[in-house]
Amino acid sequence: MRYTKISMTDVIIAGAGAAGLMTAITAARRGLSVTVLEPNGKTGKKLRITGKGRCNVTNDSAPQEFLQKVCTNARFLKSSLYAFPPEAVKEFFDEAGVPLKTERGERVFPVSDNANDIADTLERMAKSAGVRFVRERLA
C-alpha cells in the first residue's frame, strides 16, 4: 500500500463530491490552502449520475417558494438556500462556461444534458484555484 504525506494545509476536505468541490473552490478563492481527499479516484462520482446522468443543478424557484413547495424540513436548508440562492448557482456556472436551462418543475440542467460537464467544471475550477487532490487512501 502506498501512503501520501500531507504537508501543511489550511483546509482538508473529505470527499470530492459537489459539496466538497464547492467548498474547496470557495476556500481556495479566499486564499486558503486546500487539500481534498478522494479515495475513489474520480471527482464528483455521484454527481456524474444524478438526474439520470443529466445533473439537476438547482431549482429555479425563489428560495421561499422552493422551501414551501419541496421541503419537509425547511429550517435545515433555509440558511444555505438564502446564502447561495438559485440565481447565484446559475450565475456561478454561467461564468464557468456551463450554460444552463430550466425545464418543467423549475428544474435546472446543463444545456448539454451531461452531468460530466458540471463535475468536470467543478474539478477544473478547483485545480485552477490551487486545490490539491489526494486520490488514494491515507493511513
Give the ranges of each region predicted by the language model.
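Short N-terminal binding/cap micro-motifs at the start of the first secondary-structure element
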Residues: G20-M22, T43-K46
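Short, positively charged and aromatic/hydrophobic N-terminal segments
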Residues: Y3-K5
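A conserved short coil-to-beta-strand element within the FAD-binding core of flavoproteins
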Residues: V134-A139
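Glycine-rich active-site loop/strand segments that organize a redox cofactor
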Residues: R54-T102
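Short beta-strand to alpha-helix junction loop
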Residues: L77-E87, R104-R124
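N-terminal Rossmann-like FAD-binding beta1-loop-alpha1 element of flavoenzymes
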Residues: T9-V36
